[in-house]
Amino acid sequence: MAVPLVILRSDIFMEKKLCILAIFLLCICFGRVHAQAWSFEGGIPSRLSASCDKELAISEAYYKDGKKSLEWQFHPNSILTISNSNLLLDKDKADKYGITLWIYNEQPQKDSLQFQFLSPKGHISYQFSFKLSAAGWRACWIGFKHMLGDKKEQEIVQWRIIAPNREGRVFIDRLTFPVKKMNLRTTPDQQMPYNNSLTFRDLWHWCRVWQWEQYQYDLPLPIALTKNERDELHNVETRLDHVLALSMPSKESINDAYETFRKANIKRSLSGFTGAPIVAPDELDRSKGEMSWNDIETMLSGFAYDAHYNNSQDAENKYFLVWDFAIDQGFAYGSGMGTNHHYGYQVRKIYSAAWLMRDKIWKSPNCDNIISTLLFWSALQETRKACTQERDELLDSWHTLLMPKTIAALMQTDERERSRALKGLTRWLSSSLHYTPGTIGGIKIDGTTFHHGGFYPAYTTGVLASIGTYISLTNGTQYEPTKEARQVLKSAFIAMRNYCNKYEWGIGLSGRHPFSGSMKDDDIASFAYLALAGDLSGQGDAFDHQLAADYLRLFTGESKEKEFFKSQGIKAAKAPEGFFVYNYGAAGIFRRNNWMVTLKGYNTDVWGAEIYAKDNRYGRYQSYGSVQIMGQESRKASGYNEEGWDWNRLPGTTSIHLPFELLDSPLPATTMAKSREHFSGACSLECKNGIFTTKLMERDLKNFTSDFVARKTVFCFENRMICLGTGISNTNSIYPTETTLFQSVWEKDGEGVRINGQQKNQLGFHQNMHATEEHPVCLQDGYRNQYYIKKGDVQVQIAHQESRHEKNREFTYGDFSSAWINHGYAPQNGTYEYLVWIQPTAQEQKEIHPLDTYQVIQANNNAHIVYDVITGIKAYSVFEDLQLKDDLLFLEIPAETMVMHKFSDEKVLVSICDPNLNIQEKAYTTKSPSRPISKRLILCHQWELVSESPNAHVEHVGNQTLLDVICQHGIPVEFSLQKK
């Protein structure tokens, strides 16, 4: 949810000494002037004065902090003056400092309060205005950076508020000046539309609601709806009733509403209310009894359930009282509440509750204010226009606000407005469902879904459910999203189906949630909803058979959709099989027979892990070439459990084994490190078999080893993985470097591990071995996977492990069997070679000797080349420009290229990939698109394309063939060649 605060990018390399010096200087600067919170609980502060002393008073009529506020009963053009300690706004302070307060206005007016900041000479260098256009509490937040004024004199000794040219009064509370670090996501609103220029960046989409409010519909409002239009609108509303219907609300949700209401202590006062202050989470202090949007949600939803399902008149009365109070507190049309970021996650039930209460809302005296609030906070106003093609952070909007937008559209009292709003919403949704460029949020061309500038399945769940639900609501009506949009959406569904086994994904794809996250029931239901909206396969069927079959595989209960699909002859799909390339995530997914392997790296455009202050603190190695086997339908069943997990030993990774206090992220805020290397990702042949490769390098940070490098490749054929590593080097002489084979939960009654056929199943077991080609080591983990190591010092253990919780650093414990190749301390050009045989059958073990199934042609820092005997595939991971002497097909292959080929009769099937997205701008998120990369390979003999390819071209020079291939988006280019 939270937008990261500190991002490590591949083009930003901070020198440690400069960082320390900068932090030291900032601390000195901040130490000179302290943020001052002005309290009115003990009377009028001495530094405040007004044009007339009688204008100021302390009031209990309204408050936003404590139980009292400052009442200013002003005369025309009165001045409220506040003296402060000298504040010198150097460049750093001018960029970061500001002021925050809340102002209560009893009646909407057309004028403003003027704020001015004065130098010792009385010069006004900074100023801004605050519109009094709304009644109730409104936030007044602004940094000096965004104020008006000539900004010539930087010393401020006094500031003042100038009243309008009339009599009136306002109440002031929650005043802090100077604020040392203004909230970057300060939200423009009706009162202060220009208090933050950053909100025009799509990254701050939450804060753009007032900007979007200025949009005008370019869709005409119909004079009247036709009968067909009215019927379609009614169908959508009826379906929404069904979606939101509860068989019986939980007593807990109703009880929570009454308990929260009791704590809120809402009382009418003059023209407004007193009660628990409602503020954004960023300034919330629950120890003082303050509340936020989720408390409004708790009260409104609980009272709505009690009123709707139990016919409680008391609940109905309280429902509307809470609405009046919330609007008075600033949860209202045109209000930004200081900052509104991520509010969508806290208001969704407000909308579903409003739908249940819609008839009563339409009859209520405050109907207009309630509906305008619902419309504004749903951000429906953005949909008055089509979605811009470069809109960022779409997953948040789809997930949290698509249903609120839908409900808000249908809450309008005029059916013509409802119809137009729904048309606009569908157009916006359809135009947002396109393949977005660069690393901004949305769906990528390979089906990956992006959030926080990266491939993020944890944010995809819920998104699929929300859009799928909308499609089910609008199916068969004019409001249905376009076929093109649904086709893009399908690619995200298929991708999630591929990288989940059955519902869960691997740790490498987990972002900041390493042991959690899965497809939910609503996501699964949306497979059916999208299928029923129409065929997307091009076969001309009445519905999409592929999605329907996937739904039957994933859904285990009973539903009308399941019954329908089965009646149409659809059978549950088998689990996906093949090798799937997702290079927008530098990832490959290898699948057969209900198991799944997640292979994960990182590069200049793909971050390796998301680490927050309280999330995934030890997740540094998630993308260090991880090779995680999920042999069962869940992580736990596959042997992965956080309790006692050694964060240094994610299978497949090459890592320096650190104490947890050193593995813990050195940055207190967010770390999303990208590499300086481009070459990391996957390639496939016929989507059946594939390669994963990574040029591993570690960043230059505290407790990192900046010269740690390695070159790693995993060749995936059928149910075998050949893992090669070369150039493993670093100067860390304190802690050993390891390549982890496996780490899995050990159970006393389980299979334990096998070493060269001998079972070991005793807690505390540990054995060291040296593997050679003449005497390889054969291991079997407790989950029927076998490991054949041909090079290196191998260590195996069954141990009771002490670990740390990834969020709170508390001690955790668990029993695990583990095996790894020990490269020693400060290795130089270390190597490894091992084969993983995934769940071989008894028949396979009788008929196949796994080490005879492949040949390593080359394994050094220039290239890893393997020939697979069983499939006949030859695969190349080329790190540096390569010239080949004895190859049957290639003479030269350029650096950072993956190639796979297979001969068949007189033809050869070829796949070529560069996983580099080649995005020009290296930033947290960027709209800069993936750019084409030209690759020239030289083939021996004359070859020609069997059929034309838009991305491959051949030219003949003598008895050689120049093969030019255009790679883009990290998508493999596959084609067939034949001898000329």
Regions found by a protein language model. Name each.
Residues I58-I79:
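Short carbohydrate-recognition loop motifs
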Residues W72-G149, R166-G168:
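Extracellular ligand-binding interfaces
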Residues H34-D53:
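Extracellular carbohydrate-recognition regions
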Residues K151-Q154, A163-P178, L184-P188:
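Extracellular carbohydrate recognition
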Residues T226, R230-K520:
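Aromatic-lined, polymer-binding surfaces characteristic
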Residues Y470-L909, C913-Q942, H969-I971:
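Extended polysaccharide-engagement surfaces of secreted carbohydrate-active enzymes
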Residues I142, W159, D173-F177, Y834:
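Extracellular beta-strand elements of beta-rich domains used
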Residues M1-Q36:
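Bacterial Sec-dependent N-terminal signal peptides
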